[in-house]
Amino acid sequence: MGLYDRDYAQDSRLPGTFSSRVYGWMTAGLAVTALTSLGLYATGAYRALFPMWWIWCFATLGVSFYIQAQIQKLSVPAVMGLFLAYSILEGMFFGTLVPVYAAQFGGGVVWAAFGSAGIIFGLSAAYGAFTKNDLTQIHRILMLALVGLVVISLAFLIVSLFTPMPLLYLLICYLGLIIFVGLTVVDAQSIRRVARSVGDHGDLSYKLSLIMALQMYCNVIMIFWYLLQIFASSDKRR
């Protein structure tokens, strides 16, 4: 749910282990998020924490902005710690909201969104990793679209306090899904590009691989989130 400096990572020269490091940390982050969410559900703590879901949301934004602003000054262990903190906070966010969706729409909606997100992310990342087309221009368009999505979402949040507009929200969810699928493709191509470059194993290269792991983590999380909204909306209209 955070935004990262993607252009900063695209032109860096990194060692050959960069790609496996990125996806390894992304997977670790997702595992931490899943375990945190499951822990809240198993203990029933999500009921008490549900009113504070917005705190976890803003906390993830704060961590992501801090990493982006302080990446040059932070040590590798510090970035690792912040990455894990981000993953835990996302687990707190989803751990308080997903059980509510499951109770209202059924667990099948959650599992359908989870499985679909995994398939869509995998196919998108594979295409980005193996396509020979230059996606640089598409990346710039997607970043502008992402800014527009944030503005539209904030405007919708304000207007919806007075007038419910479920169809407009559904359109926003589809737009968000398209944007993050596209970002997955271009980020995967960026990972492949820098992975082919030859560089040392210094701290900067490791920190940059963690940043790109966060980017891919954010992509798959947001794909899941928008799919969950879409599936829940479809179930509600039946």
From Swiss-Prot:
Its main location: membrane. It comes from the Bacteria. Keywords: Cell membrane, Membrane, Transmembrane, Transmembrane helix. GO terms for cellular component: plasma membrane. The chain crosses the membrane at residues 22-42, 49-69, 78-98, 105-125, 141-161, 166-186, 208-228. It is a multi-pass membrane protein. InterPro entries: Bax_inhibitor_1-related. It is found in: Cell membrane. GO terms for molecular function: calcium channel activity. One of its GO terms (biological process) is regulation of proteolysis. Pfam families: Bax1-I. The keyword Transmembrane helix applies. Belongs to the BI1 family. This is Uncharacterized protein CT_819.
